[in-house]
Amino acid sequence: MWSDPIADMLTRIRNANMVFKEYTDIPASNLKKKICEILKREGFIADYKYIEDGKQGILRVYLKYKGGRKNRERVIHGIVRVSHAGRRIYVDKDHIPKVKNGLGIAILTTSKGVLTDKEARQLGVGGEVIAYVW
């Protein structure tokens, strides 16, 4: 049985977002922390924090919504895992994808760390496409 911790993280965020949860808890790892940092910096989540539990730790991701209580609107409209264990997707610096014509982001792991598509283009590096968020 294969397990994909990044796909699990994205699914937890997607499911909590669909039912307007305030936050969701995710088993922590360094890669997941970096992905959360990008999501926060790009304005897709309100915040996240690391909670020590004596094991690997937990990331509590606080989701972000627009509008008031009655007419709330999701900030994350879609979040999709691109490269997975059965099919790795690598791109070079000239073929970094644009998500929704620049309205979304692609998250990449590169030799310079975890970056958005825009940052990777500026640094001139390619890498593995982890996810699309819009």
Curated annotation (Swiss-Prot):
Domain of life: Bacteria
GO molecular function: rRNA binding; structural constituent of ribosome
InterPro entries given in the database record: Ribosomal_uS8, Ribosomal_uS8_CS, Ribosomal_uS8_sf
GO biological process assignments: translation
Record Pfam families: Ribosomal_S8
Record's GO cellular component terms: cytosolic small ribosomal subunit
Entries under Gene3D superfamilies matching the protein: 3.30.1370.30, 3.30.1490.10
Key word Secreted present: no
SUPFAM superfamilies named in the record: Ribosomal protein S8
Keywords: Ribonucleoprotein, Ribosomal protein, RNA-binding, rRNA-binding
Keyword DNA-binding belongs to the record: no
NCBIfam families attached to this UniProt entry: PRK00136.1
Job of this protein: One of the primary rRNA binding proteins, it binds directly to 16S rRNA central domain where it helps coordinate assembly of the platform of the 30S subunit.
Subunit structure: Part of the 30S ribosomal subunit. Contacts proteins S5 and S12.
Family the entry assigns: Belongs to the universal ribosomal protein uS8 family.
PANTHER family reported in the protein's UniProt record: 40S RIBOSOMAL PROTEIN S15A (PTHR11758)
Protein name: Small ribosomal subunit protein uS8
